[in-house]
């Protein structure tokens, strides 16, 4: 999609996650089996992300703005829950990216896209679908792996209000 007139604007090398994800998997050891919700998510990406610019941007938007918003809290929360120190949650670290500034830049790019109404509708529908796919993946991961979390006595019992959240994620 890098060559597409509208979707190409959303290809950012600094968001590349494969090296971080590979490092996390190496650190964590054996690869767990792929869960059905993850397979469904991957199938959807393969179906739409290579030849439908609005769908590509919809999934890109959902993934990266989520990672640069709540993901900035989720990464440290996972590290606390599983007793990780540095390795094992690098997927959530974006070196050289200032999340609030990046989110602003991203939204400005979205505001400038000039898709016809059918592609605008596709974008909105695909964002909704991407959210649902993400929710299904997280639900399956919770069901499969939540019991493996370790209780960190230094972690607050209920940190969902934002205490302990990185300051850039709060903006």
Which residues does each predicted region cover?
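Metal- and O2-centered redox machinery and metal/ROS homeostasis
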Residues: 1-171
């Amino acid at each position: 999609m890098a060559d597409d007139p509208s979707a190409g604007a959303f290809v950012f090398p600094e968001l590349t996650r494969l090296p971080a994800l590979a490092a996390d998997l190496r650190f964590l050891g054996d690869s767990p089996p792929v869960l059905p919700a993850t397979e469904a998510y991957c199938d959807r990406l393969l179906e739409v992300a290579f030849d439908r610019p609005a769908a590509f941007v919809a999934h890109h938007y959902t993934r990266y703005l989520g990672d640069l918003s709540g993901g900035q809290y989720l990464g440290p929360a996972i590290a606390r829950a599983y007793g990780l120190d540095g390795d094992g949650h690098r997927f959530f670290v974006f070196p050289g990216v200032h999340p609030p500034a990046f989110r602003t830049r991203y939204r400005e790019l979205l505001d400038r896209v000039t898709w016809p109404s059918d592609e605008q509708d596709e974008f909105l529908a695909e964002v909704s679908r991407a959210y649902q796919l993400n929710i299904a993946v997280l639900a399956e991961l919770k069901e499969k792996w939540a019991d493996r979390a370790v209780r960190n006595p230094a972690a607050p019992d209920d940190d969902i209000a934002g205490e302990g959240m990185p300051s850039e994620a709060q903006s």
